[in-house]
Amino acid sequence: MSNMLEITLIKSTIGATEKQCAVVRGLGLRRLHQTVTLQDSPETRGMISKINHMLKVK
């Protein structure tokens, strides 16, 4: 399971740009404090880096 990431949305998308909201939806996050488990890939890492101030990653 070392190649999996647990991503939690910790900041609301209210006030975020449209692109940031699209990245949140692209990661499969819909609600505040929702956690998803995704495979660790360059694509996922790139999306995380765009909105890292809104996420908690394990």
Curated annotation (Swiss-Prot):
Pfam families: Ribosomal_L30. GO terms for molecular function: structural constituent of ribosome. It comes from the Bacteria. Transmembrane segments: none annotated. The keyword Ribosomal protein applies. Coiled coil: none annotated. One of its GO terms (biological process) is translation. One of its GO terms (cellular component) is cytosolic large ribosomal subunit. Keywords: Ribonucleoprotein, Ribosomal protein. Part of the 50S ribosomal subunit. HAMAP family: Ribosomal_uL30_B. This is Large ribosomal subunit protein uL30. It comes from Trichlorobacter lovleyi (strain ATCC BAA-1151 / DSM 17278 / SZ) (Geobacter lovleyi).
